[in-house]
């Protein structure tokens, strides 16, 4: 008996991957093996960078807080130490938002940190 191959399922699987790689450059978009490898590698990059995004944003928030704190005559570390002593539990994301969009509120927070 000849070997039976489910061509419909194979073709559908390949089509699905090639659809996902639309927009890639060169052979990465239309050669099955290259496209499959590129797509799989893209998944690993996505997994890695979902974790890296968290540290990148934290670094950005710290830079923004530091810049705004120095305008008020304080360093970042002194500001964070003062906030801890004053018992103000406010995260870096909110502090960075205050520094960028609400400078008056940020000045009030810095004043409390200086007083502590």
Curated annotation (Swiss-Prot):
CDD domains: Ribosomal_L20. One of its GO terms (biological process) is translation. InterPro entries: Ribosomal_bL20, RIBOSOMAL_L20_CS, Ribosomal_protein_bL20_C. GO terms for molecular function: rRNA binding; structural constituent of ribosome. HAMAP family: Ribosomal_bL20 (MF_00382). Binds directly to 23S ribosomal RNA and is necessary for the in vitro assembly process of the 50S ribosomal subunit. It is not involved in the protein synthesizing functions of that subunit. Signal peptide: none annotated. The lineage of its organism: Bacteria, Pseudomonadati, Bacteroidota, Bacteroidia, Bacteroidales. Pfam families: Ribosomal_L20 (PF00453). One of its GO terms (cellular component) is cytosolic large ribosomal subunit. Transmembrane segments: none annotated. Keywords: Ribonucleoprotein, Ribosomal protein, RNA-binding, rRNA-binding. Belongs to the bacterial ribosomal protein bL20 family. The keyword rRNA-binding applies. This is Large ribosomal subunit protein bL20.
